Amino acid sequence: MIDRPMYLNQLSRAVRRSPITALVGPRQCGKTTLARIFAKEKTTTFFDLESQPDLNRLQNPQMMLGSLRGLVVIDEIQAMPELFRVLRVLVDRPENKTRFLILGSASPDLVKNVSETLAGRVEFVELSGFGLHETGTGSANVVWLRGGFPRSFLARSDGDSLAWREGFIQTFLARDIPQLGISIPPPAMRRFWTMLAHYHGQTWNASELGRSLDLSDKTVRSYLDILAGTFLVRQLQPWYENLGKRQVKAPKIYLRDSGLLHALLNLSDFETLHGHPRLGASWEGFAIEQILQILKPPQAFFWATHSGAEVDLFFIDHGRRYGIECKFSETPKITKSMNQALESLNLTHLWIIYPGEHPYPLSKQISVWPMNNIVTLPKQFRYLWSTELKSEDRGPRVECFIPHFMSLL
């Protein structure tokens, strides 16, 4: 069992703040297990709507749920979409003190229904597969190769892990997509998903993908929306502003789980991964996902110009601008692109995430940071803030702050 304290803390805060908490994420990422651990020490009623006895208990949902107190957990809520309106009525009652934790199989419609029907009453907590802040950085290569899905990461061997991921892909195509009410032949979606794996880390170009697969732009867009809506693909949005430069305005596409990326590319071990032309892109996507899990910035972007300047990850908090570059190199160096990003975006600092062992500075504003030390990256933000504040204290006084995403750690 791998502890997941960060997500348990997020759930605890969300349940205190909101009458309804929605725990969302891809299938098989551990939502039910996390909910049971969270509910273990509380007065809890648990409903699993894939269980016929539990469905029978909810034949009159308003009467049943209205009589309960404490925490009520409803798993696979998409099996009874009428419950959304019932929950809205119940939590709007002045005397309501019940808290609801709802879980559902990843679905664009699920998130849409929850957001629309329960607007102002629900808080989302997004669960990912295991990250390095949970497994320990000593297992970084295992998480990178196998991905973060619990059964894939914990498999006895790389071969068993790959077999599980292949099974996940087959089940998603043959069962999960039809259960979403979507009619797409599994071979067609498999071809698209595999092609997307080859485009991992590149900007989205529907026309190019459509030509490769002999599909219309509209069709490939709908396929992408399915994978993004089920938390399997990340569309990293571009940052652009009036800089006097032609900037990229299409999103970058990443398969969120590196293990699924490697399965789709038929990369079974590190030898084949290290010899593959998508090695650098795989590293980039893996690093980005780990950073987003650890820092959880309110918003994250990439930035690029048509002349070649870019930064892989860019975010702003309380007026400070930060950049991340991901380089699969033992000796990363300052590039013209990095200097352009520092100047154009007015970055407070830029980090280069690399596979080496030790952190070190390349300049006052650029640091090299190892993946095996990535969980300590938040301390670097604290250090920067403290030194900035000391410097500013010599001039006009400024108010001390803790950036928003640090409050989530």
Which role does the model predict for each range below?
Residues 2-14:
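Pre-Walker A adenine-sensing motif
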Residues 23:
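Hydrophobic anchor at the beta1->P-loop junction of P-loop NTPases
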Residues 31:
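Conserved lysine of the Walker
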Residues 34:
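Hydrophobic positions on the alpha1 helix immediately C-terminal to the Walker A/P-loop
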Residues 85-102, 116:
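Conserved catalytic/switch belt of AAA+ P-loop NTPases
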Residues 108-122:
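Short regulatory helix/loop adjacent to the ATP-binding pocket of P-loop NTPases
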Residues 158, 163-318:
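Accessory nucleic acid-recognition modules appended to NTPase machines
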Residues 357-390, 400, 405-409:
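Domain-level recognition of nuclease-like catalytic cores that cleave nucleotide substrates
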